[in-house]
Amino acid sequence: MLGKVERSEMYILFAMTQVLLVDKISGITSHTAVAKIRHLTGIKKIGHCGTLDPAACGLLIMGCGTATRLIRYMSNLDKRYIATITLGTQTTTDDSEGEIIYSAPKPSLDKITLESIGRAAEKLSGTIKQIPSAYSAIKVSGNRAYNLARQGIIPKLNAREVRVHWKFLGDFENNQVHVQITCSSGTYVRALARDMGKFLGVGGHLSYLKRLSIGPFHLHEIYREINKKEATMSERTPSGNTQGLTDNMAISESDKHDCTEPGINCTELGIKDTCTALREVHYTQGDTLSFTRLTALQALSRIYKPIEVSQKQADDLSCGRYISLGIDSKGPVCAVCKENLIAVIQPVSAGLWRPETVLSDNRKLNSNAAQDASGST
C-alpha cells in the first residue's frame, strides 16, 4: 500500500496533469482500470471515455478532477483498432467470451478465401447501418441490452449509422483474419465480426481487439514515454537496478513488448527495433498500469485551436460571462491564459463568445500565483 506521503505526492501529480492515456490490459473492465487509478492517487473524481470490453485491451482515456468535463469532447472521436476475426463459429456475445451457438461445416470454411473476405469487408465499408451486438450497454426501455440478453430476452436494437474503413494485415490462416479498423464513435467491432461471418455464410466472432488510437491520441505515446524513462534509468543505474530512484517511479523488466501481436509494427509505433520496449510502469508499492500524462491544455489543444485571452477575459469566463474576441471561427476553441486552459468557448455572434465548459477558476490561479511569489521573496 502507498503511504500517506506517497499518495499525497501522487494526488498532486495527477491533479495537475489531469488527463491520462492508459493501456488497459485484457481481463479487466474499464471501470476496474479507473478504480485502480482512484486507489493509486486518492482522487475520487475520475472518468473515462470509450469503454473497452473486458477481453479487449489498448488505449483508454481518463480525466482526473475537473478534466472529467473534457470527456465529452473526446468521446465522439474516430477510433482505430487492430482485431482478429475468427470465422466459422458464432457466439452469443459476438466475441470469444460468449457461448458458441453455431459452427460451420468444414467444406463451407474451405471455400473461404482472402478475396471473398475482401468482398465482405467492402459490404461493411464506408457509411453503413449497423445493428449493435445484443450484449451491449445500449438501453432498451430503461434496461441495458446485456442485462436483457442474460435473461434470455433478445433485445430489439435499432440500426445506427457508422463509418468503417478496413485494412488487412496478412493472410487468412487457421480460420482467422487480422485487420486494422478505423471507425466512427459508436461502432461495435464485435458486430462487424458477426456481420462478416454472416455475409460469408459461416458465422464469425471477434477473438482479439486492441485499440490503437482515439482521434489524435495514440497508444504508442505510452511506449515512447516508457522508453524515455528506460533511458533515464540506464543513465542513473548502469547495472539496471531501479532501487533508489527518487521520482517514485520504477520500470519493470517483467513484461516486454510482444511483437507477436497481430498488426503491431514496432517501427510505426515508435518502439525500438530491438523490441525491448517496456510496457509497464510501476509506481512505488502501488498497482501496475501503463500510461502517460497530459495536461488539460495539452490534451484539448489537439482537438481545438488554443486562443490566448487576457486575465480580465479569463476572469469573465470563469464566472460564466461572455467575452469579445477578434477571431473568426465556426466551432469551439480553447481559451488559454498563462498556459492554463480556462474554458472551451463557442461563438455566439460575430466577435462574441460564450463559455461552454469552464475548466479553471482564473481568480484562484492568480491567487495561488501571488502566494507563491510572496513565499519566494
From Swiss-Prot:
<dbReference type="Pfam" id="PF01509">
    <property type="entry name" value="TruB_N"/>
</dbReference>
<protein>
    <recommendedName>
        <fullName>tRNA pseudouridine synthase B</fullName>
        <ecNumber>5.4.99.25</ecNumber>
    </recommendedName>
</protein>
<dbReference type="GO" id="GO:1990481">
    <property type="term" value="P:mRNA pseudouridine synthesis"/>
</dbReference>
<feature type="active site" description="Nucleophile">
    <location>
        <position position="53"/>
    </location>
</feature>
<dbReference type="InterPro" id="IPR014780">
    <property type="entry name" value="tRNA_psdUridine_synth_TruB"/>
</dbReference>
<dbReference type="GO" id="GO:0160148">
    <property type="term" value="F:tRNA pseudouridine(55) synthase activity"/>
</dbReference>
<dbReference type="InterPro" id="IPR002501">
    <property type="entry name" value="PsdUridine_synth_N"/>
</dbReference>
<dbReference type="GO" id="GO:0031119">
    <property type="term" value="P:tRNA pseudouridine synthesis"/>
</dbReference>
<comment type="function">
    <text>Responsible for synthesis of pseudouridine from uracil-55 in the psi GC loop of transfer RNAs.</text>
</comment>
<dbReference type="InterPro" id="IPR020103">
    <property type="entry name" value="PsdUridine_synth_cat_dom_sf"/>
</dbReference>
<keyword id="KW-0413">Isomerase</keyword>
<dbReference type="GO" id="GO:0003723">
    <property type="term" value="F:RNA binding"/>
</dbReference>
<comment type="similarity">
    <text>Belongs to the pseudouridine synthase TruB family. Type 1 subfamily.</text>
</comment>
<keyword id="KW-0819">tRNA processing</keyword>
